[in-house]
Amino acid sequence: VTYAIADPGSDQAADVARSKRPVKVHDLAMKATGTGKLELAKTGTEAFSLLGVSWTEDAKRLKGTAQVRTRSVETGEWSGWQNLDVDEAHPVDRAEPGAQDAHGGSEPLWVGPSDGVEARVVAADGSGSTGLPKGLEVNLVDPGVTAAEAKNKALDTSGEGGAGTGTNTGTGSDMDAAAFVAEDPSASPSDPGSASPSESPVPTAEPSPTDTPTDTPTETPAVTDSPSASASPSESTSPSPTESTSPSPSPTVPTAPPSTVRQPPVISRAQWGADESTVDDPAEYIDKVSAVFVHHTAGTNNYSCAESAQLVRGIMAYHIQVEGWNDLGYNFLVDKCGQVFEGRAGGIDLPVRGAHTFGFNADSAGIAVLGDFEGNPNATPPKPAGKPTRATLESVARVAAWKLGQYGGNPTGKVTLTAAADTGVWKAGEQATLSTVSGHRDAFATACPGQNLYGKLAEIRRYAASAGKNSAIPTADVNRDGISDLVAGTPGASGGVGSVTLVPGGLNGPVPASKRTLTQSSPGVPGDSEAGDNWGAATAWGDINGDGNADLAVGAPGEDDTSGHADRGSVTVLYGPALNSGFSYATSGVTSTGAKLGSAVTAGDFNADGKADVFAAGTGKGGHWNARLTDGATQTGTLTTSTSAIAYPDATTGDFNRDGYADVALNYRDAGGIGRVTWFKGGASGLTKVSTLSVKGGRSIAAGDVNGNGYDDLVIGQPYTSESGAVSGGQVTMVPGTSTGFTTTGMATIQQDTSGVPGANESGDALGSSVSVGDYNLDGYADVLAGAPNEDITRDAVNRSNPGTAILLKGTSAGLTGSGAIAVSQDTSGVPGSTETDDKLGSAVSLTDLTGYGRTDLTLGTEGEDAGDGILLYVPSNSTGLGLTQTAILSKSQLGTATRARLGQLLTP
């Protein structure tokens, strides 16, 4: 078949565009008009990605409306008007160095790479410029490009690197294109966009902007590789989770106290590209962190986590060069993916005085979440409030618990602080009794951190007091660029030698130009490539050494040991980002010959010690399980009392009882041919085998919070009647998690005769052969993607046998539903290719965010395509729904997989 493919292309032009450059700030004065407004007419500018308005009177608020519209570098089109958050503005702490020269300002707004701006400000009472603060200007911030970002093809949206087209963003965000800036910022640009229908075009103004570029280039040092390890069961010492170095104790620098809570991985200022030359005065310190205040940065929720470092650089430049602060105001920042960034300089383990909560900075630490969780329903168009993700809430809780743990603070308790100034909530000198973890609005007259984030503070406090506060942050991001990465296992490649192919995620989706193929012959990979090893039969991501990078666990059930035990099986762990060091291990505690360890693999922090552990299962002699904890301890056991082999094991990780420890659910077919699911409960000492569910197993299993109640739920793919009691065409069953484990209350089973589900139940379709869980529409409920690789499809009156289909099922507060389900096949409009006999689309599925925007995208394995070479179909999830017309195909020619390797039979996550 002939089809459109994701062309890796030539990267020469893109590499030129991705040039390193420093942060710059451009200031444009606003002028009074006869309409009683202050305006900046449409103006061509140098590149910027973040903007705001500021004024010279720090103590004065802008009582009115400030609006901006910008021109996209990528499309050349003008955006609609966007309101700036002027209500969030607050005066700088008088103790802040240089506070006497500070300016007032709106919250900065991230707009993505732009090269034109228009702005208008009007007083709330319509009194014109006399009712507005003095010295109003528009401030444009170009966050620059670091050396590491310049080299990362995943951050290229020029069409050279990614599989998609870049329309996932909704903002035309392209860090690389921003290097192409207007040579003359005062020139009159062409206006491909148009004003709103009720407006007449505004002539281009010609102001003389005052540029305030930083002199020191922004450069991110390369992340150091994990320490090497031999191909032995002993792991290497794990590195520090952050490269931030605190200053040595001195008369002005305190000693960092130990914490009762493990420090989470933090992206240091050096790593995200802070320009220290712009910080005039050294850090100041408070006596102790008695409280933690949670903030939001307002602005936008439409950013990729690959852009978070740019956003943080932009906020730092705005705080320093626009508002006149000494440094970034917050102590820490957290993005929608749960990445934690070091904020104000001075040492993350020290009590650095921030500038985040006016009146209470002398007693607290400030954590800001990137995003707007208040919204503005009165804006035109209305601006919706964002919903904080689970990853965000848990990372905020980890940081809060760690900082409070240094000083004996209780994250669920209360604290009494003395207000240092009038804040609109408290009078100067008043004793304020607050929750130890509070929102900004509890201390200062503001909407911050927004209604939706404020409403989740109780959950942050709960998690900060649970075992989860010490747990590893779940990740599939091998190089820590903010985007999850995909792994395709091909265990049958090269006569059963086996291989895995890593396809990095990017702003446009998967980046085939940066793919990596690994075998046991690859440098640094333990073991040797041998026929029948089936290396890659199962894979899993997890931060196993605690450095913040995802590490890869690979199962090889056909591995023979050196003592003559055939098919003993093994698991290999490779440390990210390089994946060229690690260790491997085999079975213990069970019969070695035929054990086939590595038939199923998953990873999670079972003992909540800050490092992910590895769970593996083997099929030999009734089946067995093996949990490899990060201290090298191993837990093992059998699955059944039979001496015959089990089959089709598949494992998933989730916190099903919400106690903060990762649990495991293992699916398999027992020796009697019946599908089973066994629950292993996490705890301080690792995993405990709890029970086998009454609900039958099938061929696939996945976990996620489908009903949005905070407990991970179990999703079981049940394609066959004889194994699972399923309908003839297969089905998907969701089993809710609760504080005591799983329950059948609220359980839902969906098949193709369920109302709302496309198609019809037909014998042999095998719906549920593969399942994956993720939130494709960012509504807070995990959705389910299920494969039916044996689905027959009729096209042009001709039936095709087993071309396959995938069905997207939606999560709701009531659980899994068939309502609104979406089917995708190669006959779906917009999807390249066409259905063919035995293509088997849906042989594997992955519902994973491969762009960093928070919505999980669809990756569909089609293992039978091209006579068994196999392909992957990538379908982006956009703000308006599935981007079917942007579907890209990744095939043998892009990924370099072996002939007849059946690419698409296994996908991780």
What spans do the regions from the language model cover?
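Hydrophobic strand positions within the blades of repeat-based beta-sheet folds
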Residues: 486-488, 500-503, 518, 535, ...
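Short glycine/acidic-enriched loop and turn motifs that connect beta-strands
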Residues: 491-495, 558-563, 620-623, 669-673, ...
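Basic/polar, cationic surfaces and motifs that engage anionic cell-wall
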Residues: 136-213, 221-223, 227-230, 244-286, ...
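Blade-edge motifs of beta-propeller repeat domains
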Residues: 467-472, 504-534, 572-596, 627-647, ...
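Beta-propeller blade termini
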Residues: 471-480, 536-544, 598-606, 649-656, ...
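Beta-sandwich interaction modules
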Residues: 35-47, 66-67, 72, 78-132
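A detector of repeated loop/turn-to-beta-strand junctions in beta-rich toroidal repeat architectures
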Residues: 496-499, 512, 551, 565-570, ...
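Acidic/hydrophobic-patterned starts of short beta strands in beta-sheet-rich repeat architectures
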Residues: 481-489, 546-555, 608-617, 658-667, ...
